[in-house]
Each structure stands twice: as structure tokens, then as C-alpha cells.
């Protein structure tokens, strides 16, 4: 089906472009959300009459989106999840989880604005793209961790696989083992003690 785009649509075209798309995509997404019109002769004439108004609305919406983008660009949200020692999550972090974390931080978005290619399945920092307007995209960072303390360590850039507590415990164990097993001490067995007494 041929449609006239009423706004920029990613991977499809700019406002005013006439593009051919599958019927289901046109009916269920583009037409339903008022992102396009069927490319009939009447609608082409209607679009030419609406063009100046649409462009003015788009510029105003883009300006508002730029203000919102400045407020949330570069934010870091922390999402706490259970995970294995290797860092694999038991489950995943989806668009809804990211929306909830941003909402707790005072940012209200729709699920269509959070562009996540696939759910997050491991601990770490993940770059998330947010489309606040069809022509304005920004990035936020989602830090997925097992605890707040681990999230702080991830944000500082520390290696979470080698925990500091584990390293300290290992150092203490080595020190204790060194005191217990003195390498300079002679091996005193009852047989060597008896031999030294006979002399």
C-alpha cells in the first residue's frame, strides 16, 4: 500500500514522502497512529493543504522534545535484579523495567519511545536509546546490578567479577597459612627427636 508520511518514521522516510509498505504495517501502525495517510489523489491534495500546518507543529514539538532531551540526556538509572555469580540475570530487563526506573527518576515516557533491540540479560552498564521525538534521539545508561553497592562499583568502573571482599579474604587466608606453615622451621618428628636425645 502506498502512503504519505505525516512525520518522520525511522527506516522509512521523512514527512511528505510517499512510500510503499505492507498492508498490515500501514493499517495497524502508520494509519492507526496518524503517522501516514493513504496515497490517494484526494489525500495528496489534502496533504498539500495541511503541509504548512504539519511542519509548524513538527517544529514546535521538536523544540519541546529538545528541552526534554536536555533534562534526561546522559542520565544513569539503576535496576536491581538477581543474577548468577557469572553475571547472567535470572530473567531479563525489558522496556517496562527501564520505563519504571526512569519514572522513579521523574521522567515519564511511553513504551514506544524506549528503543531496546533485545532485553538485557546480564549485569553491567547498558546504553539505551530514547526517542523523545521522531527526529530527536538521546541516550541514557541503565546500570543493572545485584545490589546498590554493586551498582556503585560498576559506575566507578570496577571489575565486579573480582570482589574486593573476596580479594581481602584470600589475602588474609594466605597470611594465616604463612604463619601456620613456617618454611624455615625444621621438620621435627618423634623419630628425629629420639635420635637427637640419644646423642
UniProtKB/Swiss-Prot annotation:
Region annotation (Disordered) maps to 149-199
Q: Does the keyword section mention Ribonucleoprotein?
A: yes
| Superkingdom, taxonomy of origin | Bacteria
PROSITE patterns the record matches: RIBOSOMAL_L9
| Keyword field | Ribonucleoprotein, Ribosomal protein, RNA-binding, rRNA-binding
Function summary? Binds to the 23S rRNA.
Family designation: Belongs to the bacterial ribosomal protein bL9 family.
Output this protein's name.
Large ribosomal subunit protein bL9
Q: Where is the composition biased (Basic and acidic residues)?
A: 149-166
**GO BP terms in the entry:** translation
Q: Where is the composition biased (Acidic residues)?
A: 181-191
Q: What Gene Ontology terms describe what this protein does at the molecular function level?
A: rRNA binding; structural constituent of ribosome
Q: Which organism is it from?
A: Afipia carboxidovorans (strain ATCC 49405 / DSM 1227 / KCTC 32145 / OM5) (Oligotropha carboxidovorans)
HAMAP family documented for this protein: Ribosomal_bL9 (MF_00503)
GO cellular component annotations of the record: ribonucleoprotein complex; ribosome
Amino acid at each position: 500500500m502506498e502512503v504519505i508520511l505525516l512525520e518522520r518514521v525511522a527506516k522509512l522516510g521523512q514527512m511528505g514522502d510517499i512510500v510503499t509498505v505492507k498492508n498490515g504495517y500501514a493499517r495497524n501502525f502508520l494509519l492507526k497512529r496518524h503517522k501516514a495517510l493513504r496515497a490517494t489523489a484526494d489525500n495528496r491534495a489534502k496533504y498539500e493543504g495541511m503541509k504548512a500546518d504539519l511542519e509548524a507543529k513538527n517544529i514546535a514539538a521538536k523544540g519541546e522534545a529538545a528541552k526534554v532531551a536536555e533534562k534526561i540526556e546522559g542520565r544513569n538509572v539503576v535496576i536491581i535484579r538477581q543474577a548468577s555469580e557469572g553475571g547472567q540475570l535470572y530473567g531479563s530487563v525489558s522496556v517496562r523495567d527501564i520505563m519504571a526506573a526512569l519514572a522513579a527518576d521523574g521522567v515519564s515516557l511511553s513504551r514506544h519511545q524506549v528503543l531496546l533491540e533485545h532485553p538485557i540479560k546480564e549485569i553491567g552498564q547498558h546504553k539505551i536509546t530514547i526517542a523523545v521525538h521522531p527526529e530527536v534521539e538521546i541516550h541514557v545508561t541503565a546500570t543493572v546490578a545485584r545490589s546498590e553497592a554493586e551498582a556503585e562499583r560498576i559506575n566507578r568502573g570496577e571489575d565486579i567479577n573480582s570482589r574486593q571482599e573476596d580479594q581481602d579474604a584470600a589475602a588474609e587466608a594466605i597470611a594465616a597459612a604463612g604463619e601456620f606453615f613456617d618454611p624455615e622451621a625444621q621438620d621435627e618428628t618423634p623419630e628425629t627427636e629420639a635420635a637427637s636425645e640419644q646423642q
